[in-house]
Amino acid sequence: MYSSYSLFKCLVCFYILGIQVLIHSVSSQNLTNAYLHHKCLTRQGKYKPRSPYEENLNYLIDHISKYHFRDGFRHSAGEAPNSGNFVFQCRGDSYGSICGSCYATAVAGLRKRCQRYKGAIIWYDQCFLKVSTINSPPTKMDYENTFSMHNPNNINGDTQLFNQKMKNFLYELALKADKPKADGTGLLYYAAGTKRLGKNKLYAMVQCTLDIFHCKVCLEWSIKELSKCCEGKQGARVLGTSCNVRYELYPFIRT
């Protein structure tokens, strides 16, 4: 028979194991909304308190906050030079309250990090927000406001083979993102999936903002950028205001 002390030790072990599994499950799915990067567009200047630009900006912030956040948004208000243009988009697997929470975080973060700048961009794990005085046409890709991040660890094994297969998989996802929706209302602009690469399982996603015409072109450019920053890394991403790509060796996509 088990003694009460042995039984107690077993219960403690099960409890600790359960906590570890829960922590691993949460962290592996990347359910956080970490701050990633920001950029103040200093060339667009600053606005004064209670100016027409600030009124337009506050109107847009309040207007967008009333949506249900199922996809990205692009709105403008006022006439130049006091127009405020928004590009806001959540990650393809972040929607509803998660997206709304990220929007509130992004607005607060932008006000704090780029105080009174007319133009600014901020990226979080679940969304990004861009405010600008310039209303770019949908045919123009924004390759200037981009950045990359990568896992500090390198993969084990054949780096060249991994890089090639990883890029091929991202190109496959880019083709899927550029296909029409089932209801014919537009392109998907988002694709994610997994692929077995030897002993590793690759998790990846690609996404374009809903205001551009050439999604596939933008994604292909971002995939090529991975070669400049992140060869052989266990995970990496290239983010911008037109599109982004990401891959990891752990699950980070909501299903």
UniProtKB/Swiss-Prot annotation:
Residues 1-28 form the signal peptide. It comes from the Eukaryota. It is found in: Secreted. Keywords: Repeat, Secreted, Signal. One of its GO terms (cellular component) is extracellular region. InterPro entries: CRR_secretory_protein (IPR050581), GNK2 (IPR002902), GNK2_sf (IPR038408). It holds the Pfam family Stress-antifung. Residues 35-136, 143-252 form the Gnk2-homologous domain. Belongs to the cysteine-rich repeat secretory protein family. PANTHER family: CYSTEINE-RICH REPEAT SECRETORY PROTEIN 29-RELATED, CYSTEINE-RICH REPEAT SECRETORY PROTEIN 38-RELATED. This is Putative cysteine-rich repeat secretory protein 32.
